[in-house]
Amino acid sequence: MAAQGCAASRLLQLLLQLLLLLLLLAAGGARARWRGEGTSAHLRDIFLGRCAEYRALLSPEQRNKNCTAIWEAFKVALDKDPCSVLPSDYDLFINLSRHSIPRDKSLFWENSHLLVNSFADNTRRFMPLSDVLYGRVADFLSWCRQKNDSGLDYQSCPTSEDCENNPVDSFWKRASIQYSKDSSGVIHVMLNGSEPTGAYPIKGFFADYEIPNLQKEKITRIEIWVMHEIGGPNVESCGEGSMKVLEKRLKDMGFQYSCINDYRPVKLLQCVDHSTHPDCALKSAAAATQRKAPSLYTEQRAGLIIPLFLVLASRTQL
């Protein structure tokens, strides 16, 4: 009986261990499959809301965009395997949402997303990709279908590290190509000179999808702004490191270009939140004018005193 009891006890322990193993496997299966963020909550509502709001920014002849049709065209990618979505899957979406970009208003960027959005000021100053309709509806969002199901995956979505043809990267590739083709006049580019890997990513959306699709006959020149973060390192500036690669590439392509370190209007915007930082101690002509103002005022007063005495003297004689 004792032997039978021990055998039963060992069997129970084995069953418990097996159950624990099954639970661990189930928990592992529930973990995020992909490296990226899952589908944004309320994706459809956000998309349609942004689309409806953006139409007011368009010229009257372009405001007849059908947001529902644009969503349905976008949703085609949500019906595909999350590693089998191609840039061309967004062709209809782009065609339905595309509109003209004002001349001289295009603003390309790398590693400066928030600063670009702030400086563009909702299309008032510039119109970067995130401020055209097809970019606005997807900015800062994530989306994908579940791997083996038709529902959306709210837990994780693939990045380029998981697979090349993922929904989000393919979207921005297609959008970047269209944005480049529609840009004209003076092309502006904002790069991050504090980025550890260099201001100009040799492999990136700007290098791989935007520069190759610029329409040379529509472009006057390219103006590059290399911005440095307030208090951050000065890793690269114009003519240094990866910037030399970019400048040579543009020159070889026949583009006229210029490069400016810490473009003043953008620098002033950066300093709004860092007004007391040494990087924001601007030595401007205005400050020099203010310092000289008292002496100028004194000279003006002195110049007025002599005529005043003459007037008083003439009245006394009368």
UniProtKB/Swiss-Prot annotation:
Cell compartment(s), UniProt: Cell membrane
Keywords, ordered alphabetically: Cell membrane, Disulfide bond, Glycoprotein, GPI-anchor, Hydrolase, Lipoprotein, Membrane, NAD, Signal, Transferase
Signal peptide coordinates: 1-32
Top EC category: hydrolase
SS bond partners: C51-C67, C83-C163, C144-C157, C238-C259, C271-C280
Activation/inhibition comment: ADP-ribosyl cyclase and cADPR hydrolase activities are both activated by Zn(2+) or Mn(2+), and inhibited by Cu(2+), while Mg(2+) and Ca(2+) do not have any significant influence.
A Pfam family assignment: Rib_hydrolayse
Entry GO MF terms: NAD+ nucleosidase activity, cyclic ADP-ribose generating; phosphorus-oxygen lyase activity; transferase activity
pH curve summary: Optimum pH is 6.5.
Membrane topology recorded in Swiss-Prot or TrEMBL: Lipid-anchor; GPI-anchor
InterPro entries: ADP-ribosyl_cyclase
Residues linked to a glycan: N66, N95, N148, N192
Binding locations of nicotinamide: W109
GO biological process assignments: humoral immune response; positive regulation of B cell proliferation; positive regulation of cell population proliferation; regulation of actin cytoskeleton organization; regulation of calcium-mediated signaling; regulation of cell-matrix adhesion; regulation of cellular extravasation; regulation of inflammatory response
Residue positions assigned to the propeptide: 294-318
Similarity comment text for this entry: Belongs to the ADP-ribosyl cyclase family.
Quaternary structure (record): Homodimer.
Annotated protein name in UniProt: ADP-ribosyl cyclase/cyclic ADP-ribose hydrolase 2
Gene name linked to the record: BST1
